[in-house]
A protein has these predicted regions:
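Bacterial Sec-dependent signal peptides at the C-terminal "C-region" and cleavage site
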Residues: 69-79
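Bacterial N-terminal signal peptides that target proteins for export
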Residues: 49-60
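Bacterial N-terminal signal peptides
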Residues: 60-71
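Serine residues within intrinsically disordered or low-complexity segments
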Residues: 17, 26, 35, 55-57
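Non-catalytic structural scaffold of enzyme domains
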Residues: 77-305
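Polybasic, lysine-rich low-complexity intrinsically disordered segments
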Residues: 2-3, 12-14, 19, 37, ...
């Protein structure tokens, strides 16, 4: 302590340039600097400066702790955001808004959203009536492009390509970039909540893949389910109020005998609460379930906390 005090005394005297004459006051307990005049009045064995030195110690250790934590604070503040690629094969402004809002609500500002779209995939599936080699190859190529561009997770939004996403699960696991079907967790939740499940879609190409996903989930959970479908022809692209009226009309009778109603397309999500309140049935839409699946994938990779 005395050695430290003498050094400090030297530095203080040097900085003050002789303006104030300071002398070292010390005993076996304490050491500090006082004026020459005050030093002459204080007994040598006095320990009145104990609290002063204790305060110096607290300040020293506080500054030392800040110095230790500062590098980690800087690293945390500059950590790169996780990149989430959203893969569309068909879009509307409402669809994009619902999907992106669900992701940001679930993940806050911890992500960077990358949008990719290939409309020809959906058009070819609709034209052929099934997922042929050409649209499947395009889908796989776009996934690999997102991997090369640095995406951490790829969220597949279109229900019509759900079978391709399922077929590519081993490839995505090998790549270390999860390919998430936006319907997967929604279908799991539907099986949890009931046995009589009604699938609603505006395109027939979305119904088959959703039905197969429900069947897989029911097998995994050891549960028998009954799946029915409702095709709302001409519903895609309508304004909100017109679409809600059409949905209410088409679902009036099926809702009576359903435990759960699921919307096969993300573009229908805004109508979920309306139908739920109208018929008192559990209604599930996929954006929020897709967002939860993305969060789980990023947690598994250690990219978010």
């Amino acid at each position: 302590m005395k050695t430290f005090a003498y050094r400090l005394h030297f530095q203080i005297r040097k900085r003050l340039s002789g303006k104030h004459k300071l002398v070292l006051y010390s005993n076996r307990f304490n050491a500090c600097f006082i004026s020459q005049k005050l030093r002459d009045k204080v007994p040598t064995n006095h320990i009145m400066f104990k609290n002063t030195m204790r305060s110096y110690s607290y300040i020293f250790f506080a500054l030392f702790g800040i110095a230790l934590l500062l590098p980690y604070t800087v690293v945390a503040g500059t950590q790169a955001k996780a990149k989430v690629a959203i893969f569309y094969t068909v879009t509307t402004p409402q669809l994009k808004s619902d999907v992106e809002r669900a992701l940001r609500d679930e993940l806050s500002s911890n992500i960077e959203l990358i949008t990719c779209e290939e409309a020809s995939i959906f058009k070819e599936i609709v034209a052929e009536g099934y997922v042929g080699q050409k649209p499947a190859a395009k889908y796989a190529a776009i996934y690999l492009e997102q991997v090369e561009s640095g995406a951490d997770v790829v969220l597949s939004v279109c229900s019509s390509v759900a079978d391709i996403a399922y077929a590519m699960r081993d490839i995505s696991a090998f790549m270390g970039v999860p390919l998430i079907d936006i319907n997967e967790e929604m279908c799991r939740e539907a099986v949890r909540k009931g046995c009589k499940i009604t699938v609603v879609a505006t395109f027939p190409s979305a119904i088959g893949p959703i039905g197969r996903t429900l069947e897989r989930k029911s097998r995994e959970m050891g549960k028998h389910i009954e799946v029915r479908s409702v095709l709302v022809n001409g519903g895609f692209g309508l304004d909100k109020e017109t679409f809600k009226s059409l949905m209410a009309k088409e679902l009036k009778k099926p809702a009576e005998s359903s435990d759960v109603i699921i919307f096969a397309q993300s573009s229908m999500a805004y109508c979920a609460n309306y139908i739920k309140e109208l018929y008192g049935k559990e209604v599930l839409s996929n954006p929020k379930f897709g967002a939860k699946a993305v969060r789980a994938a990023l947690l598994n990779k250690g990219l978010i906390k």
